[in-house]
């Protein structure tokens, strides 16, 4: 998905841990996002099912994927998921507002916030604000986030033992000679 959506997807995943799968539960809680002006134009358009690229560029769909699937990786952008009635309804119901405070931060930081109504009709919100996404160079836990994404992307393709070898090589690349790495990559 578009790099500008990553902090929003991370925020949705955090809120999902607190409130559950809001797409499946469909309990009527409002979900809102604050975007810098540039992102309201780039990714804040109304969601309509379409191409994979359309889904990847849609802030609303990417956040929906974060709430429903806990990720916004290639498996979340299949034609079936992009046009799934629950996904479409949830994405279309997300409210987007321009947050001028974010204009001064983005794009130096890929920031953003998502909030969930704490109870249906309460008009009270629980906001998750992130200055940067989990994979950002500004995140002190970047390596952990990148390794988790690597494993998630390849879990159905490469056996866990081989993924662990690759991860170890990459995380220790500064301490390894090139010929050692080549030998290790002969999985």
Question: For the regions a protein language model found, what residue spans apply to each?
Answer:
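Terminal-appendage/accessory-domain detector
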Residues: 1-187
């Amino acid at each position: 998905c578009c790099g500008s959506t990553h902090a929003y997807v991370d925020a949705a995943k955090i809120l999902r841990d607190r409130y559950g799968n809001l797409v499946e539960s469909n309990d009527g809680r409002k979900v809102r996002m604050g975007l810098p002006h540039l992102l309201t134009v780039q990714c804040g358009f109304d969601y309509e099912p379409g191409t994979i690229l359309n889904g990847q560029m849609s802030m609303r769909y990417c956040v929906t994927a974060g709430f429903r699937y806990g990720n916004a990786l290639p498996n979340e952008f299949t034609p079936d998921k992009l046009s799934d009635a629950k996904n479409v309804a949830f994405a279309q119901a997300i409210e987007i507002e321009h947050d001028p405070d974010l204009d001064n931060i983005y794009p130096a930081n890929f920031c953003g916030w998502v909030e969930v109504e704490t109870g249906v009709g309460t008009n009270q919100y629980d906001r998750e604000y992130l200055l940067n996404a989990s994979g950002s160079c500004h995140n002190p836990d970047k390596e952990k986030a990148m390794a988790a994404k690597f494993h998630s992307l390849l879990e159905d393709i490469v056996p866990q033992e081989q993924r662990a070898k690759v991860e170890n090589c990459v995380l220790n690349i500064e301490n390894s000679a090139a010929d050692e790495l080549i030998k290790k990559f002969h999985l």
